[in-house]
Amino acid sequence: MKVKFTMLVTAMIVLSLGTLHAQTPSKPAGGFDRLKVLAGEWQGTDESGKPVTSTFRLVSNDTALEETFQSDKDKEMVTMYTPDGSRVALTHYCSKGNQPKMESPAVTATADEFAFTFTGATNLASPEDTHLHHLVLQIDDAEHFTETWTIHEKGHDTKRVFKFTRRK
């Protein structure tokens, strides 16, 4: 009887430890940790010198990075960056009403360039409809970063470059 009771207690302890481990959130990918340095407010210009702003903030217990982008040309847009194993994934909530999804290759905590490639979209009637198809985010230094967008429309790609400086 004592042996059965001891085995039962041991099994319960082992099972509870497994449950405890399963509830512990996994550590975000190193590349995602690097993106966290962007938290804050940024002022920038597009390739023609027109003003743009971007605000980054950590949300969901620091497991997602929200970017809110505003230009004179476009209505406000939001991009959510999240860890996906050793990669970083994003969903761009475009002012056109579609939501392109992209992913970077595996990146490390010391990476300064994140090249996101299109993996799919929601609310995109046709792949030829206007949408953000690639995004390269380059962290130049603690006070500067650059975003290069590739917009795909009717079989043609157009690049837009935005250079940002941290607001003080």
Regions found by a protein language model. Give the residues of each.
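Hydrophobic small-molecule pocket/channel-lining residues, especially in calycin-type beta-barrels
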Residues: 23-168
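Bacterial N-terminal signal peptides
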Residues: 9-18
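Polar low-complexity intrinsically disordered regions
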Residues: 1, 19-21
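Bacterial N-terminal signal peptides that target proteins for export
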Residues: 1-9
